[in-house]
Each structure stands twice: as C-alpha cells, then as structure tokens.
C-alpha cells in the first residue's frame, strides 16, 4: 500500500490527511488556518510534514496558483496567499518525494477517478471557494497548456460592471462567482438598491454584510438576501455557459464550499437553455471538499 500525506492549501484554511493509492483516507482530516505571513506558513508546512513523514511514502500538495509540476514550485501565486509563496521550493520541505498540483486540477482528477465523473473523458470541475478555479479533463487527460496555467477560468472576463478583482484586474469571473464575489454582490446591492433598508441586515454597513449573512438571509426569505443570491447565481451561470460552449464537456462538477448553496438541477437547466453544444450534466463533487487532496495524492502515486 502506498501512503501519501496530502495537504490542501486554501486562501483561508489548510487541511491535511494521509491517503492511499485508491483515494481512501487512512487518518482523520486535520485543519488549521492558513498563515498570513510566508515564514509562518512555511513553518506550518514543516510541522505537518515532521508530524507525519515517518508514516508516508510521499507528500502531495494541492494549492491555488499556477503550478510548475516539474520543479515543485508555484510559478504564479494567488493574491489569497502570502507574498513570497511562489518562491517556495516544496521539494525541500521533506526527505520524501514531493508532488505539487493546482488545487482545481487535483479536484478534477479526483472526480474523474473516484468521484462524480468516473469514466467521463471530457469533464470539467469548477471549484467555488474564496476564489474560482477550473480543472479540465480533455480526452482523459488533464489540460495544462504550454505553461501549466490552462484552466484558469477565474480570470475569464464576464459582465461589464467594472468590478475590481483581488488580482487588480476588472470583471474576472472569480470576482463574481466566488464566495468573495457573493460578498461583493451583497455590498453592491446594499449600496444601490433601497431593498437593503428593509432587510434583516439593515443595521449593518454594506461592507459588513458577509457571505454567511446572505446564505442565512436566503433561508429566512429575506428579500435583499434573495436578490443578492440570485444576482450571484446568474453570474455563475454566465461563466458556465461560456465554458460549456468552448469545451463541450459531458459533465461539469461543482466543488468547493460555495457548491453547498446551489441547486445543481436549476443551474443545469439554465445552462442547457443557452448553449449551442450538446446538453450537459451538472453535479456536485462526490469527493467533497477534500477532492483536491485526493486528486493530488492519486497524481503523486502515478508520478512516483
């Protein structure tokens, strides 16, 4: 049996677990906050590896950013991670072999091998969390592109509302369809629509309304929250329509924390009404919020 220490590095939290070559968990998932300073984050990595290294054959990271799988570095990191993240040589963190993969690519591979898209050689996994990522399986292979940055759908331009993304570009899909995007939309509606004055959050400043406030408000039938969520949902659908028309997949799998809040059948129906290719299926990830770790572990086993 091959044992892999899999570590998922997100913008706000870091998870880790030991996984075998079948994608099965051999330990409990542990979580901690993602450090905001690069020195503290590197030390966190070292502590996790030191705690588990003797029990595993290799280490696999699933991380945001454009990953160079040949030199175990992140060539271009996300603004959600500390400055200096792309200077880390992950191979130096352990005496065991180290594999690094983009988190969305890893999630896509997990869904293809053991999750919601088994046997579907053309499928896409979209991760909806703090940001938006995409992993593309084309004819049974991961789409990487010439520089390893293929599938960065979060940077796709949509709308024309001039919203500034965390990357400082305007109108990136990520700035609309992510959890951060939902917060931006909440602020946008609060500042421009009188409906906010009658909402359950009317005593807050627009910038104080959180993603979780909106989700809670929808459950309470708060009209402001429902409008915000519907606007966010339409921005999500717009991006999915564009992706579907370009890649013609069999299935789109939705992964990440924001996926918990959507009705996949509703989204599927809306997308299929607007596309020019064959109808698609939209599913929630079966590998769950740990698909990145599973996929990274499976890919590491294939490499080593």
Model feature map: region roles:
Residues 19, 101, 105-113, 259, ...:
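Glycine-rich phosphate-binding/hydrolytic loop that grips phosphoryl groups
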Residues 55-64, 99, 248-257, 283:
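Short glycine-rich phosphate-binding loop at a beta-alpha junction
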Residues 14, 174-241, 247-251:
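A mobile "lid/hinge" subdomain adjacent to the ATP/sugar-phosphate binding pocket shared
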Residues 33-46, 58-59, 65-124, 264-274:
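Glycine-rich phosphate-binding loop and adjoining helix at the ATP-binding site
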């Amino acid at each position: 049996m091959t044992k892999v220490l899999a570590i998922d590095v997100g913008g706000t939290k870091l998870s880790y677990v030991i996984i075998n070559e079948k994608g099965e968990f051999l330990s409990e998932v542990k979580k901690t906050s993602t450090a905001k300073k690069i020195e503290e984050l590197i030390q966190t990595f070292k502590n996790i590896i030191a705690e588990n290294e003797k029990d595993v054959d290799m280490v696999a990271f699933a991380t945001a950013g454009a990953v160079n799988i040949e030199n175990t570095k992140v060539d271009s990191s996300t603004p959600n991670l500390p400055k200096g993240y792309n200077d880390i040589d992950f191979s130096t963190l352990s005496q065991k072999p180290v594999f690094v993969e983009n988190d969305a690519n890893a999630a896509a591979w997990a869904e293809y091998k053991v999750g919601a898209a088994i046997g579907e050689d053309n499928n896409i996994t979209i991760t909806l969390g703090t940001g938006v990522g995409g992993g593309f399986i084309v004819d049974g292979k991961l789409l990487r592109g010439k520089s390893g940055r293929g599938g960065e759908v979060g940077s796709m331009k949509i709308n024309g509302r001039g919203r500034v993304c965390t990357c400082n570009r305007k109108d990136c899909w990520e700035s609309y369809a992510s959890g951060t995007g939902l917060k931006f939309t909440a602020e946008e509606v609060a500042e421009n629509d009188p409906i906010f004055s009658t909402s359950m959050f009317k005593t807050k400043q627009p910038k104080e309304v959180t993603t979780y406030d909106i989700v809670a408000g929808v459950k309470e039938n708060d009209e402001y929250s429902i409008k915000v969520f519907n606007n966010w949902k339409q921005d999500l659908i717009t991006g999915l329509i564009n992706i579907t028309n370009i890649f013609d997949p069999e299935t789109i799998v939705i992964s990440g924390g924001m996926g918990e809040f959507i009705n996949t059948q509703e989204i599927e129906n809306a997308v299929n009404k607007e596309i020019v290719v064959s109808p698609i299926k939209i599913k929630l990830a079966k590998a769950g919020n740990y698909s990145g770790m599973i996929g990274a572990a499976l890919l590491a086993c294939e490499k080593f």
